[in-house]
Design a protein with these regions (language model features):
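Short, well-structured N-terminal submotif of metal-dependent ribonuclease cores
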Residues: 1-36
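Active-site neighborhoods of divalent-metal-dependent phosphate/nucleic-acid chemistry enzymes
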Residues: 75-119
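Residue-level signal for well-ordered alpha-helical positions
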Residues: 17, 47, 127-128
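Short amphipathic alpha-helical segments and helix-helix/interface helices
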Residues: 21-25, 63-66, 103-104, 122
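Alpha-helix capping/helix-boundary segments
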Residues: 9-10, 40, 103, 120-121
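PIN-domain endoribonuclease scaffold, especially VapC-family toxins
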Residues: 28-31, 38-87
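Acidic, PIN/NYN-like endoribonuclease modules and their adjacent C-terminal/linker elements
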Residues: 108-113, 117-148
Length: 148
C-alpha cells in the first residue's frame, strides 16, 4: 500500500518522536510506502521556529529528527505534477485549506490516499464527496501484525 504523507503527520512526530506516527514512518520493514510532494519539506522549514519553540529542540536535533521521519518518504516535485491536477486540487481545497493543494494534487496524479490527522481537510474533502484520506487506525492495520 502506498500513502501520501501530509505535513501534519510530520509535525506530530516532532511533538511525539517515539509515538505511533513516528514509529509507523520509521519502520524499517514497512509494508507501506510513503510519498509526499516536496512542498512538505518547505512547510516544515517554514514552521521550524514554531516547532523549536514548542518542543525545546535545538535546530540540529530537529533536523536530525526530520531526516529520521522522512527517510522512508519518496518526494515528488510539484513541477512534475500536471498543471490540470494542480488547478483541480486548488479548486477542491480552496474552501478547506488552500495550503493542502499539493497533497491533493499528488493524490489526483498518483491515486493514492492521503494519510492525515487534519480533521478539517479530511472532513472537508468528505463533505465535497471525495474519499481521498486514510486514518492512522487504517494505516496501523496495514503495518502492524495482529496480536493473538
Amino acid at each position: 500500500m502506498i500513502v501520501i504523507s501530509d505535513s501534519n503527520i510530520i509535525f506530530s512526530c516532532f511533538y511525539s518522536p517515539n509515538g505511533v506516527l513516528a514509529s509507523i514512518l520509521k519502520e524499517k520493514k514497512n509494508r507501506l510506502q510513503f510519498i509526499a510532494p516536496d512542498f512538505l519539506l518547505e512547510e516544515i522549514e517554514e514552521h521550524l521556529p514554531e516547532i523549536l519553540k514548542n518542543t525545546k529542540l535545538t535546530k540540529k536535533q530537529a533536523k536530525a529528527l526530520l531526516k529520521d521521519f522522512t527517510q522512508n518518504i519518496t518526494f515528488f516535485k510539484l513541477d512534475d505534477i500536471p498543471q490540470r491536477n494542480i488547478e483541480k486540487a486548488q479548486r477542491i481545497v480552496e474552501s478547506i485549506d488552500p495550503d493542502d493543494y499539493p497533497f491533493v494534487a499528488l493524490h489526483l496524479e498518483k491515486g493514492h490516499k492521503i494519510w492525515t490527522c487534519d480533521a478539517k481537510l479530511s472532513n472537508g474533502l468528505k463533505e465535497k464527496g471525495y474519499d481521498m484520506c486514510v486514518t492512522t487506525k487504517e494505516i496501523k492495520t496495514k503495518t502492524y501484525k495482529k496480536s493473538y
